[in-house]
Amino acid sequence: MSKKDSLWFKSLRWIQKKLVHTIVVPHDPFDDLNLDPSKPLVYVMKTESVSDIAALSEMTGTLGLPSPYDDLEVNGVSAPRVVCLEGSKPLFGERESAEQYLHCFKRLLSVHKQNAELDIQLVPVSLYWGRTPGKEDDTMRAAVLERQNPTWLRKCLMILFLGRHNFVQFSNAVSLRYMADEHGTDKRIAQKLARVARVHFQRQRKVMTGPQLPKRQALFHALLKSDSITKAIKEEAASKKISETEARAKAMEYLDEVAADYSDSLVRIAERFLTWLWNKLYKGINIKGAEQIRQLHHDGHEIVYVPCHRSHMDYLLISYILYYQGMVPPHIAAGINLNFWPAGPMFRRGGAFFIRRSFRGNKLYTAVFREYLDQLFTKGYSVEYFTEGGRSRTGRLLAPKTGMIAMTLNSVLRGVERPVTLVPVYLGYDHVMEVATYHKELSGKKKKKESVWQVFGAIRKLGNFGQGYVNFGKPITLHNFLNDEVPNWREDIAQDPEQKPTWLTPAVNTLASQVMTNINDAAAVSSVTLTSLVLLASEQNALERSQLEKQLDLYLTLLKELPYTEYTSVPEGSGKDLVSQGLELKKVQIESDALGDIISIDDSIAITMTYYRNNIIHLLVVPSLIAACLLRKERCTRDDVVCVVNDFYPLLQAELFMGIEDPKVYADSILDIFVAQGLVIENGHFEVADDKVNQLLLLSGTIDETMQRYAILFNLLAVKPNMERSELERDSHRLAQRLGALHGITAPEFYDKKLYATLSVKLKELGHLTDSEGCSDIKRIKDRANLLLRSSVRQTIVDSVNAEQKD
């Protein structure tokens, strides 16, 4: 009878099933870790433990992996399925020798010497009973509740009290074939394997639990002794004519206002609540790119998460996802407006630290906040902040606020030893709870102050919100960024550490823009966003079902055959599947008659649906521009298309934070897909296929409102090339309001003053606002913009511009 069939092991498994709830990290080891099911596999664990192996056995059965109780049989040689680096620890006395497990490594390596085709995978497995990092200088508690090397008695207590928070983490497999071929098969290599594995387990534990937590008051007193805060206290006392004791008390108040008070116990309780909440709200949360972030943590990077900001749910979603992906929830910079009872204290114990909207004029607060942020980086706590500064009301990314990015970069310049890496995060939802409120605010209604009653009101309305999306974008390691942007930055800082470098502000602006671009590069396409994009481009926000499905299939083909970036995610399935999902979520409605089904967006939520369209509009705006060019320019050639894309892409890039490396190559690839899909026929020039005109018309509709804005700008500049930026912004906004009133344009971003400010800055950067030398370029771009408009819209713009200038 095998071990796993013995009465002892059956009894143990029965007890653990009652007491233990295990979470696997990553959730799909075969996909995330590239395990090869056709190759033999051996598990490597840090410490021999009957309960750990029993927990592992439950998970391997679920995942279809070999049981740890079944010995490995290869070439007539039998070896344990689990190799442990340390023996079990008795209640009294010394730990058992691990020498026998070193022999296992040697035996496995020697088998590879005999069989050149064999390749055994060594898979490190870490088990955690709870994830408490512990407190600094808390030696008594550590001795009582030691988790890394517990005796069997302590392990029983851990299972009893922490069994519902058991994590089994699989790591990337090590190929013994590679080790044998590259390094040999002797005892020295076996010892090296054991050393590397020990380091790996140590790092993995820190990724899972995080660094030890400081005692809050001890941290405050240490920070008050720092040079920067000491200096700020003296300056505060001198400027306000108060004593240094009073100034120091003020600094302590600021620290108490700012600092988090992280509690692992509260995080465990919150995990249960959030599991219930997500299961009630969403059918699932789609995650992409978590493994690369786990690896950065493992490699010792200081991680700063910089997500887009859609909803108050963002705070909860990221922390929850990271917790379940085997990483520590970050310390989150939250607006001081969220520090209301009872949410504020709970957020603080969940890792939130609070930040005022403005530091201007308050040097003491600035010094306190910067020193606290430096301390987080130095101690190794991951941090999260929203670079937009607030939630987007339109669904587009907002222009970044650079304050937190500047402070992060300053921390690097002051000598943070670990590599600091910004991780852009794209967050998407099939339903954003606040979206109706956003549009009320955009229409002029005063924003409500956050309170606990808003939270209760939102929870009361919980329903089927579809799915959530968390995509981790391309990381930006700040040392590498500085090396690329300012190769001599170390020398500049060394010469005068107190002097602000002249290159710092431009570098911060470049970095902030890159963060936003990387967020959009990781966009998640969904049934709601893509269906909104199609229907809002139609005349009455309605299409025949078959036509809608066909259009969605075209967009899916574009997004899959020409991926926007490797970080972008596109839904599986067909256009038919996406329509069904939209109907299920009640984002679209269906009407049936004798001729078939009509899918539409109800007029009452049409403006709301622009929010979801705007989440992904950047992914299809260039194909839309090309479609408009093919439809409205006679005998259009590839060169014509490329010229149009080159003229408008800089503005699209500034407005939508796009990161296409080579617009010409991208445009050519889109044209190739159009030809392959039969949308156009190429014979020296392009001819639109008669039966595909409607598909191109729908696609071109996506850029209509954007092109109308550009036409307003360039028609104004063509009439008055020497306009000041402020004048251009004012006049273009006024004309946009007139155009919207005459042609029924309701999209909130069409009237956004900040958007016209962004475009005017880009126009100045491109040289269109500097002098009269660019008049020929302005006229050319104006003519191209006008060509791409409907005649009625074009005439309204031309007439309005002429009337504006007469006034």
Curated annotation (Swiss-Prot):
<dbReference type="InterPro" id="IPR045520">
    <property type="entry name" value="GPAT/DHAPAT_C"/>
</dbReference>
<keyword id="KW-0808">Transferase</keyword>
<dbReference type="GO" id="GO:0005886">
    <property type="term" value="C:plasma membrane"/>
</dbReference>
<keyword id="KW-1208">Phospholipid metabolism</keyword>
<dbReference type="InterPro" id="IPR002123">
    <property type="entry name" value="Plipid/glycerol_acylTrfase"/>
</dbReference>
<dbReference type="InterPro" id="IPR022284">
    <property type="entry name" value="GPAT/DHAPAT"/>
</dbReference>
<keyword id="KW-0594">Phospholipid biosynthesis</keyword>
<dbReference type="GO" id="GO:0004366">
    <property type="term" value="F:glycerol-3-phosphate O-acyltransferase activity"/>
</dbReference>
<dbReference type="InterPro" id="IPR028354">
    <property type="entry name" value="GPAT_PlsB"/>
</dbReference>
<dbReference type="GO" id="GO:0016024">
    <property type="term" value="P:CDP-diacylglycerol biosynthetic process"/>
</dbReference>
<keyword id="KW-0472">Membrane</keyword>
<feature type="short sequence motif" description="HXXXXD motif">
    <location>
        <begin position="308"/>
        <end position="313"/>
    </location>
</feature>
<protein>
    <recommendedName>
        <fullName>Glycerol-3-phosphate acyltransferase</fullName>
        <ecNumber>2.3.1.15</ecNumber>
    </recommendedName>
</protein>
<keyword id="KW-0443">Lipid metabolism</keyword>
<comment type="similarity">
    <text>Belongs to the GPAT/DAPAT family.</text>
</comment>
<dbReference type="GO" id="GO:0006631">
    <property type="term" value="P:fatty acid metabolic process"/>
</dbReference>
<keyword id="KW-0012">Acyltransferase</keyword>
<dbReference type="InterPro" id="IPR041728">
    <property type="entry name" value="GPAT/DHAPAT_LPLAT"/>
</dbReference>
<dbReference type="Pfam" id="PF19277">
    <property type="entry name" value="GPAT_C"/>
</dbReference>
<comment type="pathway">
    <text>Phospholipid metabolism; CDP-diacylglycerol biosynthesis; CDP-diacylglycerol from sn-glycerol 3-phosphate: step 1/3.</text>
</comment>
<keyword id="KW-0997">Cell inner membrane</keyword>
<dbReference type="Pfam" id="PF01553">
    <property type="entry name" value="Acyltransferase"/>
</dbReference>
<keyword id="KW-1003">Cell membrane</keyword>
<keyword id="KW-0444">Lipid biosynthesis</keyword>
